[in-house]
């Protein structure tokens, strides 16, 4: 209901929720059409994906049967490390179980992200020419292609 007043002014509303599966996240998933599952390229992050997948299934059962998973987005990713490669393989297996995909785009580990957060600016304002800004652009393009068909 909160978005209804402004819905006609926007094509999309992006709800960035905390990683904890609390009331805010459940409410956001209830209101959403699509969900992107972010996963850091570390050993424990995919455990969170499993928990979120269970929550998504419950949301589909009880409040939002049309909720779709757009894909899994790997973050803090470094393709040169063996752990990132292992996490990518595990994410691919998990995506197959969830009937979704791992995005071709990924977000690299970069100090500039922390700097932008510290000064409370989006990466596109703080460092629009950075490699990580390119990562986000590539991800947005891939996401929009998937959503819009």
Model-derived segments and their meaning:
Residues 1:
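PAPS-dependent sulfation machinery
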């Amino acid at each position: 209901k909160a978005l209804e007043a402004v819905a006609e002014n926007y094509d999309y509303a992006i709800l960035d929720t905390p990683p904890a599966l609390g009331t805010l996240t459940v409410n956001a998933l209830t209101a959403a059409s699509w969900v992107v599952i972010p996963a850091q390229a570390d050993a424990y992050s995919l455990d969170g994906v499993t928990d979120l997948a269970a929550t998504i299934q419950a949301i589909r059962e009880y409040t939002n049967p049309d909720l779709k998973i757009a894909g899994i987005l790997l973050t803090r990713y470094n393709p040169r490390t063996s752990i990132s490669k292992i996490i990518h393989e595990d994410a691919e297996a998990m995506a197959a179980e969830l009937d979704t995909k791992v995005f071709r785009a990924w977000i690299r580990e970069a100090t500039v992200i922390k700097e932008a957060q510290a000064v409370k600016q989006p990466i596109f304002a703080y460092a629009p020419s950075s490699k990580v800004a390119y990562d986000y652009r590539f991800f947005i393009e891939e996401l929009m292609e998937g959503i819009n068909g």
